[in-house]
Amino acid sequence: NVDETTFAPYVVHPMTKLSFDAQIPKKGDQRQMEAWQRIGTYAAGLALDSAGLKGNKEILGRMDMIVAAGGGERDLAVDESIMSADAKGNSSPGFLNERLMNDLRPTLFLAQLSNLLAGNIAIVHGVCGTSRTFMGEEAASIDAARIALARIESGQSEIALVGAAHNGERSDLLVLYEFGDFNLKESYAPVWQREGSSGFALGSAGCFLVLESREHAEARGAKPYARLTRVVADLAQRKQPGAVTRSLEAMWPKLGVTADSGSLITGATGAEPVT
């Protein structure tokens, strides 16, 4: 699923066409969400459906929620009008604050707070236990899963909804990454074939899981899909020779996973050559 034309020369992986009504039935709820929030709330609903928990007020009322989210989306029309007025010398003192207060919806004026995703999930799906939001991307998502697992293993939580959402179809985001020359350009190619044209293709996606203790799952007769045993992460100074290799060698023993005993999910960016 690749789009090479809408944001040319940048390559993106677009979100498939969804019927948000299936998981967010109220149009009013949908209208006050930006795309990344609709994606996340939709994915959270799918996870609850799959776990057999949709509408179970008793469990949803105590279900914990840990979400990873970015800093929200910008209103490009407002940005463009402000910059155009400034370039023409039409920006008087207080102009910027006045335009922001008058032109942006309340949620955008609040800088699209990251925890709005968790708030919308709570409103739409009734998940009312403790809530944590980590602002960021790969590292935030890994920490969300890591902390949910740790809380369940320690007995601090029995069941948790964990996940993240991202909208990669944003001109403002592509511009930010282009400042660092991080975008994949012109045409898509698998990471193993990107030598000489490094970069990653931004994508739109939502992913949510219901994690729960074995005892809790068995008590409600739930059939598990998999067992999560370890979540590990590290930060490597990539400019230092051998840093990535040392980081991977340090993390691998902590997983305790072999080719015959489990599956491995990685948060590698897809950029060559580090992936």
Model regions: which residues?
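Active-site-proximal alpha-helical scaffold in enzymes
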Residues: 40-53, 114-127, 131-166, 201-222, ...
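Conserved beta-ketoacyl condensing-enzyme motif
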Residues: 2-125, 129, 166-168, 173, ...
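Glycine-/small-residue-rich "gating" segment that lines the acyl/pantetheine channel
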Residues: 86-104, 146, 150, 165-220
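Condensing-enzyme catalytic core mediating Claisen C-C bond formation in acyl metabolism
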Residues: 1-4, 184-266
